[in-house]
Regions:
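Conserved catalytic core of sirtuin-type NAD+-dependent deacylases
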Residues: 1-226
């Protein structure tokens, strides 16, 4: 099992929301946490999409060695599933098959009125507020905003995978975003079951792990595969 966060995608050029140089430490008219909330989206969709298109829809982003290393482990039958807090879809772009996106995906959209699913390529992002071609209501990304709960099916299936894992690798996450970070407690960390952590710096979970590796996750996972 692999459980990953924003640090998995930083080597692709995406910002880590909570690092020192990350998105949440930059200055905007509103705090990013407020902009990326349900209430803000409903009240100020124009400002929401301005931020969303500028900071989350970054063109030319491609999978990095970490994504491809995980795909290789999955292909070899050594990795049963990937649970990610990321919304960028890079695991699937790298060819990974069993991916649970706890916070949704920027590649899926639906309208707020009737939940019509709108293919990404059919959305006109040149407008200030994209509208549904069927009912003309607002379109929103299928991502979990602040004030919203996680998808129950994805949550329960993720927990089941963690409970059945004999090795859990955690990478690129500060484990500060709940309820996603709380899933780690479902891992049966006893007997021969091992917990491995890969991060660039020290964190609160280090002392509980059987192995902690500090460094770039792409380089470390590539070495594991080779």
């Amino acid at each position: 099992m692999f459980f990953g966060g924003a640090g998995v995608s930083t080597e692709s050029g995406l910002p880590d929301f909570r690092s020192v140089d990350g998105l949440y430490h930059q200055k905007y008219a509103f705090p990013p946490e407020e902009i990326l909330s349900h209430d803000f989206f409903m009240a100020r969709p124009k400002e929401f999409y301005q931020f969303y298109k500028e900071k989350l829809l970054i063109p030319g982003i491609l999978p990095n060695p970490a994504h491809y290393a995980l795909q290789k482990l999955e292909e070899q039958g050594k990795l049963k599933a990937i649970i990610t807090q990321n919304i960028d879809g890079l695991h699937q772009m790298a060819g990974c098959k069993t991916v649970y996106e706890l916070h949704g995906s920027i590649h899926r959209y639906y309208c707020v009125k009737h939940h019509h699913r709108i293919p990404e390529e059919e959305i006109d992002f040149s407008t200030s507020i994209p509208l549904c071609p069927h009912c003309r209501s607002m379109i929103r990304p299928d991502v979990v905003l602040y004030q919203e709960g996680l998808d129950e099916r994805i949550l329960s299936e993720s927990i089941a995978h963690i409970q059945n894992a004999d090795l859990l690798i955690i990478g690129g996450t500060s484990l500060t975003v709940y309820p996603a970070a709380g899933l780690i407690r479902y891992f049966p960390h006893h007997g021969n079951n091992k917990l491995v952590l890969i991060n660039k710096e020290e964190g609160r979970l280090d002392t509980e792990c059987d192995l902690v590796l500090y460094g770039k996750i792409g380089e470390i996972l590539s070495e594991v595969v080779s």
